[in-house]
Amino acid sequence: EVVIEHGALLRIPGILQNYDSHRPFIIADKNTYSVAGKQICSLLDKKGIEYSSFVFPQEDLEPDEFSVGQVVMNFDSNCDFVIGVGTGTINDISKMVAKVAGLKYMIVGTAPSMDGFASSTSSMILNKVKISLPSACPVAIVADIDILCNAPKKLLQAGFGDLLAKYISICEWRISNLITGEYYCEEVA
């Protein structure tokens, strides 16, 4: 389920109901909590939906084993759903937590800074090495246009760059196929 519209946060209680969730666990950082997390918590309070949350206290968040551990150490085992509030790093951490917990997962995007919202992998740092790990694929992606439009300029630029890189990487893949015989799949490209 993908919801991209003005006021999209208002749809979150209905999405939770569609997936029979009665107590979500919300993951955010200080910035994404102030941009959208606080509104989500207020909305859930008004609807009488119980939830638990963890807001990362640090400024420079990395998608590593320490960050996943912080969430796990604060995770409420009574929760039946995971809501990530943020973009790249929060998305990757939340997907990993949802996979480990065996729960459904929703991402609430706060900036169009990357294109991995629907991915079933997480870009993680393990022992200081960047790797891709299988993770939970979101059952819902929620993007409030008003929030996305007010994202910092550098995050808007990052998203544009991410989109451009996809086209360039496909061209490089084709060239590699022609020159070296590298496997190429038209369907994936």
Where are these regions (language model features)?
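Short, conserved acidic/polar surface loops in the N-terminal third of protein domains
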Residues: 63-67, 93-96, 117-119
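Short, electropositive, low-hydrophobicity segments enriched in small/polar residues
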Residues: 9, 90-92, 113, 120
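A glycine/threonine-rich phosphate-anchoring loop and its flanking beta-alpha core
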Residues: 101-189
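A short, small-residue-rich loop immediately preceding and capping a beta-strand
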Residues: 75-111
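Residues that form or flank phosphate/diphosphate-binding pockets in enzymes
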Residues: 35-36, 92, 151
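Short beta-strand/turn micro-motifs composed of small residues
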Residues: 27-28, 86, 143
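ATP/NTP phosphate-donor binding region
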Residues: 1-81, 157-165, 171
